Amino acid sequence: GMTIKLYQYQTCPFCTKTRCFLLAHGIPFENIEVHPIFKKEMKFSKYKKVPLVTVEKNGEVLELRDSSLIISILSSYIINEGMNITELLKRYPTTTVVGEDGKSKQETLNKHWLISDEADLATVENDARKEEAEWRFWADDYLVHLISPNVYRTYREAYQAFDYHVKQGRFNGTWEGVVAKYLGSIAMWGIAKRLKTKYKLDENVRLDLYKACNKWTEAIGKGRTFMGGSKPNLADVSVFGVLSVMENLDSFHDVLTHTNIKKWYYKTKQAIEDHGGQTLNHKYYDQLVSKTC
């Protein structure tokens, strides 16, 4: 068997997305909360960003980075019984891309797609697989950038967010928790302002968040409970994971009040808690194909 550890922040939407995937599919893992300032829990690794997943099997430990890549690799591992994670990593090559800021960075261009060696699956190009990958990309490329400007919109909201998450986490009642709460809220309040400018958001950043949530529910449509049909697929889990970081905060209450997302959100939450995501085996693809035939 494998031992999986997830190193994460309570307040990070990429981390909640990864955690929701593991929970949705009943994958056992150890959840390790990293202090957002000191990060001593990650001193074993040269990589200092979260989420970070370590996979230990037969004495070998592999590090998986990037939330969407983690999800795709673990999903692909489950549906490819004869392939190990090291082999799968080779199927997700990194390439150098230049961002809008002119800076070069390493990116995995196919990270929103699953790998399969079976000929019938490898050649299938159907609307459901494409739709899932496109909305996973949307969650990473657009939706996630609306979270910090909304959660940390004012200093009061920033403090509310850190106060709540510190109380929920393992740093509650410690001096590390106090540092995280006060320094973290001040830092993120400032970062939220810069992100609003960087991503050219409306002066009232809530409006962009409302539009995004309604766009998502419109894409699902009235004929489906989830984008995955009767069960959440990886797009559902990704969008839910990003939004769930706002739970119990003012921004979350406003979203439920001003958009149509409430019904989908709580059905997805229940499915994740019940390990009710689409089964990651060959039946998974049968379900996808059946929706387009």
Predicted regions and their residues:
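Alpha-helical recognition domains of nuclear gene-regulatory proteins
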Residues: 21, 73, 212-215, 219, ...
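Long, positively charged, glycine-interspersed low-complexity recognition regions
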Residues: 235, 239-293
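Acidic carboxylate-rich catalytic motifs and surrounding loops in phosphoryl-/glycosyl-chemistry enzymes
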Residues: 33-34, 230-232, 281-284
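GST-like fold's C-terminal all-alpha helical module
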Residues: 100-260
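GST-like domain detector, emphasizing the conserved glutathione-binding G-site
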Residues: 1-172
